[in-house]
Amino acid sequence: EISCSLVGSEMCIRDRAPEEEWNARFAAYCEKYPEMKELWDQYHDKDLPKKLWDNEEFWSYEDKPQATRNLSGELLNKINKVVPNLFGGSADLAPSNKTNLKGEGDFSKADYSGKNLHFGVREQAMTAIGNGLVLHGGVIPYVATFFVFSDYMKPIARLSSLMKVPLIYVLTHDSIGVGEDGPTHEPIEQLAMLRAQPNFHVFRPADAKE
């Protein structure tokens, strides 16, 4: 029988040299490309979102009644100006969720520079991808769909909570009066479900200030 601690120790010894080699290559890269090092530090700065507190433009809104999903879309684009590593998308509902980052292009295998992800109609996979992006680090991802479809996200959203992964969920159309789509699109019990989930922080803003 081999103990887990022994296996762990052996792995540390085995992998020490490759790690040191990688660190040396990274240090050389940073020295050669200081502007990329600055960008790297910015992308891994966990205090970056706090800079929004002192951003007057971020807090200014037109004082008139507006749909909260429109305000949410405006908010995402304001955040994008200050937080360059904001990255995400919707489950084939971006025009309705208002989650498109304007002027940022679409992320695809043909173009890695885009910041808008098109997940398709697959809420569960989208949530898993979002968790993976957070765990990898370097980006602040968000995922979006209609609130009622959080049912399809639930098993993986629960894993977000268990891992304490700060994935951002943008869940719009939180109303029993969503119009022509009828009762299949009217969220009733979903709010209670998410609020009952440990480590899942639910914010339900009613206007621009909130």
Task: Identify the meaning behind each predicted range.
Residues E1-C12:
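Single conserved hydrophobic/aromatic residue that forms the stacking wall/gate
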